[in-house]
């Protein structure tokens, strides 16, 4: 079976279109909701009120409201690289991290699990059944190449239309070597999705000038070039969605990272506003500011209205 047919068969299994066209960041009942993280020195800043925020829609300041995040559960799709390079200690640390993340989910929070090598597999759909999720994590095994582009698309589709707060959490340790989707196709997918994207990637030092084929760029690249391109692409995608890229030099920190990210997800702010009528169709730029000196603000850069 060819690379394209492997990917296509998974998309058809989920009832997804072959071409990733127009998954929308939807404006429900003409109210726009922006998921925002505010931090300083790597730590969340909780307890900010409405007056601490300024939100600009196409350069115009809007009146905003803050939704109590404790009343809106999480819908998190966890997308795990299980290619051959993850075998051994790395996989054990990865599984421990995901188990800890699942244990930290509360109440009506839901999670889904997707694993990928050159195949993309939906291990568990969105569920609040912790036992099902733990079993799905234990069932993964490493083999094959890496198709994280296609897996990210599947993760975004899994939370599309979610009634809770949609988040995709991606782990990958390598450059894409097998996907149907190319680098330049990913940013429009993320911008049109309503999900916040987080990504975790190890920073590995490989000796020598070795090369490997990059499916995402359709060319041969050195390991250093691959790492640089992957990091740049992941940072672009996560920042566009209002999420973050986490790089780690130690896979032994994965459990801590997963736990910290779940805590961060629970301390984000939900801002809402109503655009003035008539609402122009197409892309609208969003900028969020806070009146806290030195604070970092992570929020999506805009929304589509159709």
Regions found by a protein language model. Give the residues of each.
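Bacterial N-terminal signal peptides
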Residues: 3-15
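Scaffold/interface architecture of coatomer-like assemblies
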Residues: 15-306
């Amino acid at each position: 079976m060819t690379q394209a047919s492997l990917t296509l068969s998974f998309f058809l299994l989920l009832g997804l279109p072959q071409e990733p066209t127009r998954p929308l960041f939807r404006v429900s009942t003409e109210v726009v909701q922006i998921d925002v993280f505010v931090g300083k020195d790597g730590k969340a800043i909780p307890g900010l009120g409405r007056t601490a925020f300024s939100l600009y829609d196409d350069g115009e300041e809007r009146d905003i409201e803050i939704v109590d995040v404790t009343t809106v559960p999480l819908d998190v799709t966890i997308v795990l690289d299980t290619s051959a390079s993850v075998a051994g200690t790395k996989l054990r640390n990865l599984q421990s991290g995901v188990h800890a993340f699942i244990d930290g989910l509360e109440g009506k929070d839901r999670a889904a699990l997707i694993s990928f090598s050159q195949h993309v597999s939906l291990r568990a759909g969105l569920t609040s059944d912790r036992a099902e999720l733990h079993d799905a994590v234990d069932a993964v095994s490493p083999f094959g190449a890496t198709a994280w582009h296609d897996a990210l698309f599947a993760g975004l589709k899994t939370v599309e239309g979610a009634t809770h707060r949609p988040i995709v959490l991606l782990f990958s340790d390598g450059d894409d070597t097998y996907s149907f989707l190319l680098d330049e196709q990913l940013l429009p997918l993320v911008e049109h999705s309503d999900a916040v994207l987080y990504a975790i990637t190890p920073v590995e030092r490989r000796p020598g000038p070795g090369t490997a084929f990059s499916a995402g760029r359709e060319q041969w690249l050195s390991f250093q070039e691959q790492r640089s391109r992957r990091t740049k692409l992941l940072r672009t995608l996560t920042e566009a969605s209002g999420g973050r890229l986490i790089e780690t030099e130690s896979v032994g920190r994965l459990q801590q990272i997963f736990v910290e990210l779940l805590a961060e997800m629970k301390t984000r702010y939900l801002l809402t506003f109503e655009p003035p009528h008539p609402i122009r169709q197409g892309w609208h730029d969003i900028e969020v500011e806070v009146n806290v000196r030195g604070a970092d603000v992570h929020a999506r850069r805009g929304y589509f209205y159709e």
